[in-house]
Amino acid sequence: MTALELVDPDRLSLFRYGVLTWIDKDGFPFSVATDFLLSENGEILLKKPSAHPTMMGADVAVLFNHITGIPTGGYTDRRYMLVWGRVSEDKGFLKLHPEEVSEWDEKVLPFDKLCAAAVPQGKKYLESLQPSIDA
């Protein structure tokens, strides 16, 4: 599956940077912010972090997000895109090979409706924990 089949380049272009996360060789999560660009054929190219431990071929997550603070308090214009996949070296960049995407944009789905939609999943999760709490 290509990046264009999973990731809408128009929506991705609304973000200025990504946060690249992977599990390092010692088993700990490692995250670093990085710039990115979209190639003419829709590939997601991440700028290599200056100190980038080996992550080639490993599962990675890249979080692209945006939030605007309101001077009087609170936030607006919230959105994110989380892309799971793998990276490979490509002409001085890290090419992201997307495998799964989740995203949210409050202009499409307001925050209160997002929370309401998550209630069944949260309830199922809490019910699965109940036996261990009762023990």
Per-range role (PLM):
Residues M1-A135:
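Binding-site signature for planar aromatic cofactors or substrates
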